[in-house]
Amino acid sequence: MAIEREDQDLNEQFHASKEYGADQIQILEGLEAVRKRPGMYIGSTSTRGLHHLVYEIVDNSVDEALAGFCDNITVTIHKDNSITVEDDGRGIPVDLQKKAGKSALEVVFTVLHAGGKFGGSGYKVSGGLHGVGASVVNALSTYLDVTVCKDGKIYTMSFSKGKVTKEIECIGTCTEEEHGTKVHFLPDAEIFEESIYDFDTLKVRLRETAFLTKNLRIKLVDEREEELREMTFHYEGGIKEFVRYLNKGKEALYPDVIYCEGEKEQILVEVAMQHNDSYTENIYTFVNNINTPEGGTHLTGFKNALTKTFNDYARLNKLLKDSEPNLSGEDIREGLTCIISVKIEDPQFEGQTKQKLGTSEAQVAVQGIVSEQLTYFLEQNPAVARVMCEKSIMAQRARAAARKARDLTRRKSALDGVGLPGKLADCSSKDAERCEIFIVEGDSALGPAKEGRNPETQAVLPLRGKVLNVQKARLDRIYANEEIKGMITAFGTGINEDFDLSKLRYHKIIIMTDADVDGAHISTLMLTFIYNFMPDLIKEGHVYLAQPPLFNITKNKKHYYAYSDEEYQNILKEIGAEGADVSRFKGLGEMDTEELAETTMDPETRTLLRVNMEEDDKAELDITFTTLMGDQVEPRREFIEKNARYVKNLDV
């Protein structure tokens, strides 16, 4: 059913010249600033920056794969948290780079913006950070050793903190069939706040890279435990398999993934898509394997093609009556999972980050290829076209009903203060940066929360009914749910296309539920809603989870609060169990006003957990929320079994 073109020369147009020598390496500037301002080059010195070092080296190997010269990449985490990345590409050039007067290998690892990615014939398309990778990793590592197999010889070179410690040396021979690069490095603990690599973080990124690079095999090895841990990612179906993976836990509306591939305007385009029974669209866009979370011209081209092609087909085949309006793009994309991947020789991005593609030719290329091939697909698969049309029409009706409900909500809150939920105990301050709102479950916690708060800056909104599971609901049901409607109105931002962060009434939104399984379920329902309809609240750091204590230990008229069984045991050891009076809180309602204020609400003494998300995490987060809140039981059971060891609160 998938549309595939047997065009053997298509990828070859994007493969680089086999000439990959010193003269393909171009030098733009020096390396001095990296150790002084590492955040400028890798984003941060947190755990995120630590993992970014691995991606930089891996991306260089992936560039070899995109150029058609690499089939295998192995990433190894060693016991000391050093990393080895090994590939079977052509091997970094080792001959003299004329302009620098030193070996190309040394240039690659000691000069910023050096690489075969700047107009030479070394690479046609490239991800990474335009050649920044290897030198930045070197600058931020205690040591870095590189081994190159090339032209029948084995070369090594060593560095420390960006400086050469051992000159390039030929240490032996290899067969002509052996070729590639091996980089072994240890991140500098003086630079990074965290020095421990997380297997799962690397796994997610490497799996995504393998999906986007058809037939590339990436192996991840962890040597830190007694039992070696290994995972291999290899997808012959490429982004088609990516879509199937993302739709795991959802019910696909038709069996096969729709696939479009072609080349136009010297741009290689791949699109894979499939509708499922959910009500949200999940579209992920990539340029040269780099995620573009803000979309850009390639996304615009796809949306234009999908909307026009589908409406044209529906009209021609009488799936839409003449009297009915066209289906909107949003209606057609409801429940759509889609990957858009383009390969461009010199992509232009908007702004300083690679978040949004600006290359105008990409819109023309994607729109043309998707229009032509999707038209052919719909004509060949009328049953699938009908299923897509029926879902889109249902979405259109639900959107119309939601619009009426939304307009009603807007009218109610048109005047400042008017239309706020009646159950909201608001704060008196109008300075949003100072204000926070506690979302509490039930009336039992409402009394102590209202009495224990600071009424100037702390608001309280109780949830009296069951929060809707938005993972299984259309917009019209969402606007009809009183609890969700109350949150939308109280927060002030609106949702979806109406969302406006500048109208946020409280800079801290604190979910305060009981420290038990039911409380965790309510928190998850609320996070599912915020993630799907107000994700910027999470991205900008406005959403928190309150951390109420589990135990109150009293001895000699002094109170000690424990937030876990482990902390409880430690406190008893410290103060002595004899004469200690211990009470376990079953819920927020069991605390008196002073206890709740001191342990959970007072900014001076409470503990909050900030909810974080990064754009790069979106695909995995979508899968997690679908697993936890979707219809299918088996993926949820597997998730619980896998993560049971992390559970802190267990009702027995």
Give names to the regions the model predicted.
Residues 36-55:
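Conserved short strand/loop->alpha-helix "switch" segment adjacent to the catalytic nucleotide/phosphoryl-transfer site
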Residues 1-24, 31, 55, 63-65, ...:
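GHKL-family ATPase ATP-binding module
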